[in-house]
Each structure stands twice: as structure tokens, then as C-alpha cells.
Amino acid sequence: MADDGHDQPRAAAAVYRGFIDAVNRKDLDAAEGFVDPERYRENCVGFTRGFVRWDAAKESIRRVWKGIPDLHVELPQILADESVVLAHGTVTGTATGRLYGAPATRRGCEANFFDFVRVDNGRIIERVQQADVLSQMRQFYGKGLGTVGLTAMFWRLLPRVARHPVPRAVAGG
């Protein structure tokens, strides 16, 4: 797919790699050079409440950096066509700060993720990331607490109404 002799597929993969390289450097200004801020939307499953725009995506990664300041992404596999990039990556880091309210454990982690990225006119316009969040939480907080941490993480993503349903009237009462 990416190495079929056409410039556009390599360009799409290069745009994505450039974006990830900027994120690895914690340079969101440089990362913005690889996205179309007006059209960009991202769903980082488990970390954002569905699709968010570029400003909210930047805030989300800043929150992650507070908990995992040495966050680093490796991209061992990337496939691309004219406008889509699919990537399998590995993220590593150490929980030395608060991560979404959870305390620092000073434990490291290595977890896999998959990215689906759409590129238009040399800029990223959409990104969907699915990370192995359960593995991350277990490595950071241990088996039992990792599951609790994962539950708490997803709990905060639920809309307030879903977390506090209105009691139903008792029939015949």
C-alpha cells in the first residue's frame, strides 16, 4: 500500500510520522503543522468523550503528559493509501504524576495501540486511536487497582445523566 510507487501514500504516512515525532518531542505547535485545525477531529478511545476538535485533543495529551511525562510512541507498522493511514504502535512511559486523578506510582508501562488517520491535502483531519488501556492501568496500578482505575476512567467519560439515572416510578404505587 504505502510503497506502491505513488507519492501521495508515502506523503500520508510521512504526515502521520511527522505528527507523532512532534508529539514525542512534546511540541504541539509543530504537531499542529501536520493537522488541519479547522477540520481536525479525534477520538482517543477512553481518554476523550467521543470526537473532539484540535484544541480539546491538545488538552487531552497535556493531561496525559502530566501523569506520564516521559510518554514515548514507537511506530513499528504503518500502512497507508492515498488518504488513510493505519498504524500499530507501542507507547511507553512512567506514571510519575497524577493521571486523570490517579496518584503517581512511579511504575512504567508498555502498551499497544492502533491509529486510524485520515489525511486530506497533506494535513490530518481525523484520528481515531484505540489503546490497550486495561494493560496500561494494570501495569501502573496493579491487577486489582488497574481494573478499578480503568472503571473510574470510563466512569468519568459517561454523561452525568447516565451516571445518575432518574428512579423509575413503581407500577401500581
Predicted regions and their residues:
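C-terminal and inter-domain tail/linker signature
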Residues: 1-173
